[in-house]
A protein has these predicted regions:
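Short helix-initiation/N-cap motifs at beta->coil->alpha
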Residues: 88-99, 187-215
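A bilobed periplasmic-binding-protein/Venus flytrap-type ligand-binding module shared by bacterial periplasmic
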Residues: 138-150, 257-270
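Sec-dependent N-terminal signal peptides of Gram-positive bacterial secreted proteins and lipoproteins
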Residues: 1-26
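A conserved helix-loop-strand patch within extracytoplasmic ligand-binding domains
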Residues: 131-180, 286
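Short, well-ordered beta-strand elements
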Residues: 54-66, 84-90, 157-158
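Periplasmic-binding protein-like
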Residues: 168-175, 280-300
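Ligand-binding "clamshell"
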Residues: 119-131, 146, 236-248
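Bacterial lipoprotein signal-peptidase II cleavage site
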Residues: 17-45
């Protein structure tokens, strides 16, 4: 820091000398640019000092691969500039990342939404909390050989995910498109299941595990439909623009099912967690999401 102070002092004296000699506007602009750059360097150095003050500059985060792991990889260098070493562990299920955070193996995870986190806490006696919403992945209704909702044939088969929160989203999407009717008070927070369907309009609705919906759709008969979560659609190579319908971005599903950063209760204000959140909620990340996922992933901060 003494070195930094010396640099700033030298720059200040230089600027005064140039002003006394009647320096040009261009020279003043150059000096201002140098001062701005130096200030930015000082801010980065200060962040690095905070990160390493207690030796805790490693951020261990668990995530599913698409898009969570990819987004984390994007911010890895940005966190390094702040003095943090982001270490990413990729999981292919929705149980182990929460257990790893609860057990202290990870500092945070990024793969789930709040309803799932609440359900996991209740079932496992854990105390994990959300510290930030990052994005949501719109559910899409896809048709095999069907080009519009109006063309869905009577008695068509519709496959939807079976777990509670995903089943709710799928059913709300089907209702949004007029394919089924649910109770008037049906909403994302309270949840619904196929047992709550008031009128299925003759469609054959079946539930399967969320991670198998895309595969079943790929092997389905012509005229069949499926409601697929955004990340599974991405992994299966489906383009959200080909979906017959997607969740309304202004609906409560977008906020309710936003993907979050989860940590142990009490860790919310750790410097490294604050750094992780602020970096993930930056304009650079929003632009990255917009440019790489074609609407299948939507920033929500």
């Amino acid at each position: 820091m003494k070195k930094l102070s010396s640099v700033l002092l030298a720059l200040s004296l230089s600027a005064l000398a140039l002003t006394g000699c009647g320096s040009s506007t261009d020279t003043s602009a150059d000096t201002s640019a140098e001062e701005t750059t130096t200030a930015a360097d000082a801010e980065t150095e200060a962040a690095a000092d905070e990160a390493t003050a207690d030796g805790d500059n490693v951020i261990k985060v668990g995530a599913t691969s698409t898009p969570h792991g990819e987004i984390l990889e994007f911010v890895k260098d940005k966190l390094a500039e702040q003095g943090y070493d982001l270490q990413i562990t990729i999981y292919d299920d929705y149980v182990l990342p929460n257990k790893a955070v609860a057990d202290g193996e990870l500092d945070a995870n990024y793969f789930q939404h709040t309803p799932y986190l609440n359900s996991f806490n209740a079932s496992n006696g854990t105390d994990l909390v959300s510290v930030a919403k990052i994005h949501y992945e719109p559910f899409g209704l896809y048709g095999n050989g069907v080009t519009s909702v109006a063309d869905v044939a009577e008695g068509a088969s519709i496959v939807i995910p079976a777990d509670d929160s995903n089943e709710t989203r799928a059913l709300l999407l089907l209702q949004q498109e007029g394919l089924i009717e649910l109770p008037e008070d049906a909403n994302a927070n309270d949840g619904v299941t196929t047992l709550d369907i008031v009128d299925d309009h003759g469609y054959n609705i079946t539930t399967v595990q969320a991670d198998t919906v895309a595969a079943q759709f790929a092997n389905s008969d012509a005229g069949s439909l499926a409601v697929i979560n955004g990340n599974y659609a991405l992994a299966a190579g489906l383009d959200i623009s080909t979906a017959l319908a997607v969740e309304d971005a202004s609906g409560d599903a977008a906020q309710t099912y936003a993907n979050i950063i989860a940590v142990r209760n009490g860790d919310e204000n750790l410097p490294k967690i604050r750094a992780l959140v602020s970096t993930l909620q930056s304009d650079d990340v929003k632009t990255y999401i917009e440019e790489n996922y074609n609407g299948a992933v939507v920033a929500i901060f």
